[in-house]
A protein has these predicted regions:
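Active-site regions of enzymes building and remodeling cell-envelope glycoconjugates
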Residues: 14-20, 83-84, 172-180
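Rossmann-like adenosine-cofactor binding region
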Residues: 50-54, 166-240
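Phosphate-binding beta-alpha-beta segment of Rossmann-like dinucleotide-binding domains, i.e.
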Residues: 82-84, 89-136, 140, 144, ...
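N-terminal glycine-/charge-rich "phosphate-binding" loop or analogous flexible N-terminal tail
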Residues: 1-41
Length: 240
């Protein structure tokens, strides 16, 4: 059962796997109903997950492989009860995600899309935008991706880095903040790089956004659920 990852499917097929493609919920349910007794492995993504009732319907399931780092919708207790291995790709995409996070930050802070569109219209807008150099970057979640972002920010843009994590790290030179609010207060730019799931649900709320202030910039390369959408809309609409 795999979401569409067509470029890599031949690798699995050449390794001897018989693939059952189920990219939609209806196809997934049909595949489990039709082939449940023959399925040994499941390939999924964190937002799609794999649930207890689905695990129960696959009597010969041995492994659930999650593409990417997040596995918040995989029922770990159900897998553990059956001694089913659950794996993920933690850290594999960290460099490319970190590159993209800095690209988004540059694009946002320097207003590159709007400036590009303006030049293409033959305009020359004389607008001064902030620089990244020498600014304060707050990273919410200093895992593999957060570490890669911090490295690029320090070495590439001469930024100072602070972070908030579930626990302080003793192996980094960056300043630890005890809460997301404290981190936002100490930041010009704020990058969200946490896991998804219940533990981080709406972790970035009104209090964090208020602490970041109307001149702050925020980039979220984590799950959308980490930021309170209602609070974000309210902050934008009221220029806070």
């Amino acid at each position: 059962l795999v979401e569409t990852i067509n470029d890599y499917l031949p690798i699995l097929e050449n390794s001897g796997f018989n693939l059952i493609l189920a990219p939609s919920p209806a196809e997934r349910a049909k595949a489990i109903e039709t082939h449940g007794a023959q399925i040994n492995a499941v390939l999924t993504r964190g937002p799609l997950g794999f649930y207890a009732d689905e695990i129960a319907a696959l009597p010969h399931l041995e492994i659930i492989c999650v593409i990417g780092a997040g596995y918040e919708h995989v029922d770990l207790e159900a897998a553990k009860a059956r001694n089913i291995t659950v794996t993920n790709g933690a850290g594999v995409n960290a460099p490319s995600v970190a590159d993209h996070a800095l690209a988004l930050l540059l694009s946002l802070v320097r207003d590159i899309p709007r400036a590009d569109a303006s030049v293409r219209r033959g305009e020359w807008r004389k607008v001064m935008r902030p620089s990244l150099a020498g600014k304060r970057l707050g990273i919410l979640g200093l895992g593999a991706v957060g570490m890669a972002i911090a490295k690029r920010a320090v070495l590439g843009f001469d930024m100072s880095v602070s972070y908030h994590n579930r626990q302080p790290r003793s192996d980094v030179p960056y300043a630890y903040c005890a809460s997301p609010v404290e981190l936002a207060s100490a930041s010009d730019f704020f990058i969200v790089a946490t896991p998804g799931g219940a533990e981080t649900l709406q972790l970035v709320d009104k209090h964090v956004l208020d602490a970041l202030g109307p001149h702050g910039f925020i980039v979220n390369i984590a799950r959308a659920s980490v930021i309170s959408t209602a609070d974000l809309i309210d902050a934008l609409e009221h220029d806070r």
